[in-house]
Amino acid sequence: MNTKFIKHHIEQNRVDTFVKYTRRYLKRMNIRLEFRQGATVRTEDGESAEGFFYEPEGKDKGVIVIAKGRPRREWLTTLAHELGHVNQWLTEDVVWSKGGLPAERDAENHSQKLIKKFNLPVDARWHKIQSKKYISFLKKTPYTDNER
């Protein structure tokens, strides 16, 4: 058998396991996970994003929405990042209530840990570079506290 074929199937199994774990984890907190086909998704504010998280409110379920029309490593890092925000919300972390750059930095750190924990097919160096670019981009944009 072709080693590339085997490697791909092993990686896909890790991805499937991670997504299955994520769905079960989120279901316990009344949050659903949605994948959309495009390269970006629209938030309730009409903003274009690679993914987003809205916490549950009252009887309304929360949601994580991920744009899956991008390379696998990109949507996986976005999903892990949004799970970082779920963790902030769940633990009532001060960075969640304040929002802004500290919340994004924390979510990026959380995503790196999740990717490592689940041994996902995302190159750690690539991810670190992308995280730095993302944080640099946010520093240049009018991203205020209480904004998530």
Describe the predicted segments one by one.
Residues 24, 34-61, 72:
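Catalytic zinc-binding patch centered on the HExxH motif and its immediate surroundings
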Residues 89-98:
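Substrate-binding clefts and substrate-entry loops adjacent to catalytic sites
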Residues 3, 71-74, 116-148:
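Long, well-structured alpha-helical subdomains associated
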Residues 77-90:
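Active-site recognition of the HExxH zinc-binding catalytic motif
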Residues 1-9:
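A short, surface-exposed helix-loop junction/capping segment
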Residues 98-128:
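Post-HExxH zinc-binding segment in Zn-dependent metallohydrolases
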Residues 62-79, 98-99:
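Short pre-active-site segment immediately N-terminal to the catalytic Zn-binding motif
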Residues 11-29:
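Zn2+-dependent metallopeptidase catalytic core
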